[in-house]
Structures are given as structure tokens and as C-alpha cells.
Amino acid sequence: MSAAETSAFMDRADKFLAVANTLASDLPFSQISASMMFATARFNAFVAQAKGLEPGEVDEVTVAYFCGEYEKMLRENLAQILSSKKVPKL
């Protein structure tokens, strides 16, 4: 990604995190996390269908792709957060 694309990507992610931060004042983090994961899975199912998957079809390649991407991002964020002494703001 170019610097501009990376910046736009992070800005979009920050918008989702801003919603999570707002919800965090009233709900446990675990509930917010579960809702965000469900919403992401739901949206990615829509993306897969828009790219040609039939409604109700489960494509293991698509599942593996999204799981792999999530795992990479989670590991990267865990390493970044756990190496910091500062508790991050969600």
C-alpha cells in the first residue's frame, strides 16, 4: 500500500474504534469485541457473495483467507500493544 492508502486504511479503522470506544463506556469489552467480530464476519460474507459466491455457499478458500488475514492483524496488534508499557486506548 502507498502511504496515502495506508493513511486512509488507518482512518477507516479508527472510525470503527471510535464507535467501540463510545460503546465501551456502557458495555464490557468482551461484548463489544464479540459484536465487532460478528459484524466483520457478516460484512465479509456479503463481500464474498458480491464476488460470486452463491447465497448459503461456504467456500473454504474464502474462509481460510479471512481467517488468515484476521490472525495476521491480531498477532501484529498483540505484539505492538504487548511491547508497549502504555495501556492503549481502544
Where are these regions (language model features)?
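Solvent-exposed interaction surfaces and binding hotspots enriched for charged
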Residues: 1-90
